[in-house]
Regions:
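Cys/His-clustered metal-coordination modules, chiefly Zn-binding fingers
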Residues: 108-195
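A generic short-segment signal for beta-strand/edge and adjacent turn/coil regions
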Residues: 51, 96-102, 119-125
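Short, non-transmembrane cytosolic segments of multipass membrane proteins
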Residues: 2-45
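Short, charge-rich amphipathic segments
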Residues: 11-26, 56-72, 102-104
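Short low-complexity stretches enriched in small and charged residues
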Residues: 43-50, 84-90, 106-111
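A broad, low-specificity signal for short, low-complexity segments enriched in glycine/proline
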Residues: 53-54, 89-94, 112-116
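Compositionally biased, charge-rich terminal segments
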Residues: 34-76
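A transmembrane-helix-recognition feature enriched in membrane-embedded lipid enzymes
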Residues: 64-102
Length: 195
């Protein structure tokens, strides 16, 4: 069974690499490059984007009532998200250094670049910043907690868990006391060289 899980994890890694290659093709298709984290479009694409942008007033007129009504309850969520961002950053900088765990690089997870798209108006850009930040912080937090789980309790649950993190598949099986005792320190050691 461990071999099957290992094979599946390897297959997922291969598929992730394949996804990266497909995204590179997409960059070529839409004529942009990313250099030093800066996005550069060809001029003809920038001109096309500007022509396709819907100005704020017509955009607001076409908005549905439910979207307008829900806005005041969406944006305040940035407060607990920012608080989580701050606290998990402090947590990992204190605890991970004490445990010898490699720090999670926040910039790999919190990516806010869609505001560079010329076909988005100001409100759409703001929405994209909000979602990029929120989802980025959640992914960043998840990786920090996943490393914590690997350090403290690398055991799978007895029940099926939906949406497990990428480290979970390698944890020891529920009930495998011997495996836990023999692999616990190995799991901790592997966190020192994690990127």
């Amino acid at each position: 069974m461990a071999t099957t899980i290992s094979e599946l994890v390897d297959k997922i890694a291969r598929l992730e690499n394949q996804l990266v290659e497909e995204l590179k093709k997409q960059q070529e298709e839409f004529h942009y490059t990313v250099e030093d984290n800066k996005i550069k479009f060809e001029q003809i694409i920038l001109d096309t984007h500007r022509k396709l942008k819907v100005a704020i007033l017509p955009w607001l007129k076409s908005a549905t009532l439910r979207n307008v009504i829900s806005s005041p309850s969406i944006y305040p969520m940035v407060i607990p998200i920012a608080f989580m961002d701050l606290t998990v950053t402090i947590y990992q900088n204190v605890c991970f250094r004490l445990y010898g765990i490699s720090l999670v690089k926040r910039s790999n997870y919190v990516v806010m670049d869609r505001h560079n798209l010329g076909y988005l108006n100001g409100i759409e850009k703001f929405n994209c910043l909000y979602c990029g930040y929120g989802n980025g912080v959640i992914a960043y937090t998840r990786e920090i907690i996943a490393r914590t789980e690997q350090y403290r309790c690398p055991i799978k649950h007895a029940r099926r868990v939906v949406g497990t993190h990428r480290r979970y598949a390698n944890f020891v099986a529920f009930g495998d006391a011997e495996g836990y005792q023999t692999k616990r320190l190995e799991f901790r050691e592997s966190l020192k060289d994690t990127d």
